[in-house]
Structure formats: structure tokens, C-alpha cells
Amino acid sequence: MKTNIAIALVVITLIGCSVKNEVLNLVPNKPGTAANYWCTWYWQNYLILKGQAVTNPDAGTVYTNPAAREEMTEENIFGEQGMARIMLPKTRSDYYFVIDHGWQDKSIPENTFFTLVMDTLDFPKYAHFEPKERIKQMNVDIKALGWKGLGLWVRGNPSEEQMKKFVEWSKYGGIEYWKIDGGDIQYYYASKIKNEIYPELVLEHITGAGPINDKWDVAGLDYYPSVYSNEKIAVQELTEGSTLDKTTKGVEKSLEVIKNTDVFRTYDAAPLLVSTTTLQRIHDILVQTAGDPEYKALLNIQDDCNIAAALGLLVAVKRHPMETPRMYQGKDLHFQIAGDRHVDKRLNEMDRFALWQRIASPMPAGYGTYQFSEHNLVDSIAFQETDTWFKPTYGKMVRQSAPAIMARNIALPEVTAKDLAPYVMASKFPNGAIAIATEGRVMPDKSWIQPKADVKLKEVELNKAIGIFGNYNSLTLLLGHPIPTNIVVYAQDLLSNKATDITKKVTIKATSIEIPGDLIDEIGTMENSSNDISAPGMVLKIISN
């Protein structure tokens, strides 16, 4: 009897040690299912006259779309320093690799940019294959490098018969993503056909927008509406060089598209004010779509990772290292990446975003509720010729606005700032996870500032993941009920595989937990790559047994 008891005690002790010593990882190991992608477009543009001093920075004659198309080559994609080999080594399994403008045969006169016929002069290793086999083999090669798969850029209005052929080719080749950068919004042939024969194909549509939101040159406003605003239907010129549409569509058309596609991209924005411009576009859409499941598309907001994490959106990330300078007036000229923010050095933000979406999947535009603060923040700065290709802004003060606080399916966070306030966003996801982010500001004398505030996040639950992005003076989690005495607070850099017990480093009160901003900075950047300046991104969980 004593022997049996002794054995039992040993077993219990061993089990206890095993549990105690077990490494807790708050981030799933399995790649996410969200349709995010990294896109070649910014890097293509940066390769024009690579490494050469700039004598003429004109985007209309030198650094043009046709010139960028010529950089879409086998060497630039698959070479030793090729994009598919360099980008996102840690999380490319969560991203499609989208080959952008220039991969198709440019000698085909009809619907030149919607043929799915690869240019074999640029990609000679696929020349001996028939067209549908080429994209299949490139998809195989992209996946072999660890990516989720190959995505295709297209633009145009093929006939219904042609569109069926292209969907069939994609099914044959295992292509799961089309970036439709204009077109197919009259009859939605692609949507109708893929729903019938290849529903796995994710379609992205646009209606277009200018690089900045409307009334940008008018001083003294507190609201600068986007083309998606229901208060004013703004019409702006599209990107220079666009041959499909010369103006954007009205808001009614945009809303129709969101009902008829899988992904709606809010479109490009000028780099210095990109976050403010994009936040306004998100607001102008969600205020009309939230709560109506007919709006089934997910919103893709380009390259604002922390905003997308906090609001349950998709990204089309395009940032990349800038290691072949094109110097002009003391700056490395890049019309798509500019300013003191240096997103080229914030590559880990892409990783942390993807890892968060393994925990909390994005939400359609029509899902749940949307709230926003009555107060808007306005950012402004004078654009120079090195900041953007958009010539009407050169030497002029550009102003953009967005709500100070935005929230989906959760109460608005409370924000207290002594001086300049950051933008604050938060969401609660269907699985109970919550995300919150702060975003920086742009002032006339500074193209990027990251102010800190005291933020209170409401409706927090025990044993549910909380994603925290950005910088804070403090972040207080409000649970709304007495906190059990046996809780343990774990936090983990999303790039790490090990959570840390921070219970003794936070302030626990009756119904709240206050986290110092310095602790968020420490934990959330713990795994930053060398020379990476990404904002903090971490996951926290309050565990109660």
C-alpha cells in the first residue's frame, strides 16, 4: 500500500513538473488562411535605374509605369537577390506572392493586361510550356520557396468566354488569387464564373481612388472626405498612366462592388499621409456597410499592417528593403516609400500582422458593428517632388483627416493624451479575441511622429487573446467584473514562440489591469530583426484556472 502511494506521488510530481516547465506559446504554428499578399509593385519601381544618381526625378517620363513593367523579370523574382527569395523569410507561408504589372505578354493587342499569357522574354525558363502550364509551373516554384502561392495581377474587361478560360487556367494551375486592378465591375464575369467552377479563387476588385482624399488643399476643415464618403461623391484622377478608367467611380458603385467580390482594395495613397488617408477611406466604407451581411467582401487596405490587425482587414504589403540607393537632393528617391517613417525598415510589422491573423481572422465589411469618435484628427505636411509622383501637390500643404478613435464590435477605447494624440483603433473578433493599435501622426514640420497616450480598452475577457500594436504611455484593460485572484498575465512578442509571465510587472486592480507602455515596447519588439524599427506587436492573455 505504501509502495503504491509512493509511486502515485512520484507520478503526480513528474506531471506537475512537466506542466510547470512546459513552454507556453500564444501564437499558432499553423499558417493562417487569410488572403493577404506581398506585391512586387514597389520594388519594381525601385529597380528603375537601380543604384544610379537621379538627374531627372520625373515620374511622367523617367520613373514610369512602363519602365516599372520592364523590371518584372525572372532574375528579379527568382535570382539570388530576387524578391521571392528575399521577402518575408519568417512568414511567407501566410502570404501570396503577387506578381504585378508587367508579367504578361505585352505584345498581345487586345486586353493586353488580362490575358494570363506570361511574357516568356522576361521569364524564359517557362517558354517551352503552353500558357496555362506556365502559370502552374511558376506557382509550383513560388510554393517551393515557402509562399502560400502565386497571385496574379490583371486589369481589363475580357468577354465572358475569355473569363471562363482564365478561371479554368487558374484552377488547373492552382492559382488562388487574382488582383484585378481595374475592370470586371459591369457584369462581374469573374465572380459569377469562379463561384460555379472554382470557388477557391479569391478575387480582388477596385473602383479606384486618387493618391489623396478630397479637398486636401483647403485649410481649416476637420473632415477631408474620401471617394467612398456618402456625404460627398468625390471624383478624382486615377494614377498617372492608367488607361482603363480616367476617373474613380461613385460611392454607389463601390458599395455594389463590395457586395459582389471577395476582396475590395481601398487603393493606393501617397506615402507621407498614407495612414491618415487610408483610415478615412476605411471609415467612409464601414459607416455604410457595418451590420449588413450583403457587404461580404473583406477590405484590403494596402500596406498599413497595424491598422489592419486592429480592424480585422487584409493587406497588400509592398514595403521592401532599400539597398540600391537612387540619390537625389540627399534622399534615396522612391515615390512609393518616403518620409521619416521608413517602412523599408519596418519589415517585422508584416510578420507580426500575419501571425496575429492566425489568431484572429479578418472580418467582412458588413460584419458586426462600427463606432467612431465624433472628433477627427487632421494631419498635414507640404509635399515635395521627392515625396510623390502626384505633381499637383508639389510645394503645397496637403491635409488629410480621420476619426481619432475607431472600433468594430467593441466599445470605443478611452484615450487621454497630454499633447498630440495618436490614432487609436480596436476590434473584437468572432472568436472573442481583441486587438488594439495606435498609429502615428504627420505634422507640417515632421513627416512621422509616434505620440503616446493613456488608453483604456473595454470589454476584455479572461482566457482570450489580446493583440497589442503600437506605442502607449499606458494601456489599461477593463474587464467589467472582479478579477479572480489566481490569474496569470502572459505576454509574447508575436514573432516569438514563448510567452513571458508579466503578472508582477502590471498593476492589477479590482476590475482592471494596467500595462506600462515601456513594457509593451520591451515585449513587443523583443524579436525585432537587426536594424528593424517596427512598432511593437504582441499578444497577451489573462489566464484564469
What is each PLM-predicted segment?
Residues 30, 36-39, 46-63, 155, ...:
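Active-site-proximal substrate-binding groove within the catalytic cores of carbohydrate-active enzymes
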Residues 537-544:
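Short, aromatic- and glycine-rich surface loops/edge beta-strands on solvent-exposed regions
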Residues 23-31:
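Short boundary motifs at domain starts and secondary-structure transition points
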Residues 2-8:
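Sec-dependent signal peptide recognition
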Residues 38-188:
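Aromatic-lined carbohydrate-binding/catalytic grooves of carbohydrate-active enzymes
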Residues 15-16:
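C-terminal motif of bacterial Sec signal peptides marking the signal peptidase cleavage site
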Residues 1-2, 178:
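Beta-rich carbohydrate-recognition modules and glycan-binding surfaces
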Residues 8-11, 461:
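C-terminal (or distal) subdomains of carbohydrate-active enzymes
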